[in-house]
Amino acid sequence: TTLFRSQILDTVCDSTASRPATDALIAELEKNVDDAKVGELAKKTLIDKDELAKKSMWIFGGDGWAYDIGFGGLDHVIASGENVNILVFDTEVYSNTGGQASKATPVGSVAQFAAAGKSVKKKDLAAIAMSYGYVYVAQCAMGADNNQVLKAMVEAESYNGPSLVICYAPCINHGIKGGMSIAQQEEKKAVEAGYWNIFRYDPRRADEGKNPFMLDCKAPSASYRDFIMGEVRYNSLTRSFPERAEQLFAKAEKVAEEKYAHLEKLASLPDAE
């Protein structure tokens, strides 16, 4: 009994290892339900046997919630240090309510409340979360690298603390040429053009004396301008406000270049000696 109790306590924060340890304990308890000494305790424990293994806790939400109207709550949760996982589907717009601009909407993108294109850059939610130093953070795009997404999800789940995984999510409001059937290809293009970057920040690496930041995408190899012009949320601005469109698109491209350069610097920081 002491051995099984030790195994349960040792795996209480590991959902992968917790299940086998719990199954072994349950099997042992079931063998001893008629034992004169521990039978009653075994029966009581088995009543709540479904509660023994560590549960995988995930919060799901969109960018309107995470970046904007629910940011205060999200920030409170990750700042608490509690072992909770958060997955954000970043469509860069309020998708469920009709396509209104949010703080996740990038420069130059047309949306409700930003009919002339958004003039200020997108909020950097990942950077805010990384600033705590004890939050696991990942930015992903399944169409660009599904292995990286899987790795991020597994790492987030195994991390004993708050985790934030932000995934690029093409949306019908983007007006993708070719439609939503090519959403995965659009994600790949977004990363190749430097429009979206994928990376991971794992605080456990810092504890090991390693750089906690890992950049998982190469330098942009495709045209940023060609990418955004493949979506109505951007190319429509060239028809309604052509001069403003040029100014905002140039600004957006510069923001993207500076963002990648900054991420490269983070990734190149030396490990602690």
Residues of each region from the PLM?
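Active-site metal-binding loops of divalent metal-dependent hydrolases
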Residues: G62-G64
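Short, small-residue-biased leader/transition segments that mark boundaries at the very start
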Residues: T2-L3
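Surface-exposed polar/charged interaction patches
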Residues: S15, N32, S240, V255, ...
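Intrinsic disorder at enzyme termini
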Residues: A252, A272-E273
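Glycine-rich ThDP/TPP pyrophosphate-binding loop and its adjacent helix/strand module
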Residues: D35-E40, T45, E51-W58, D68-V84, ...
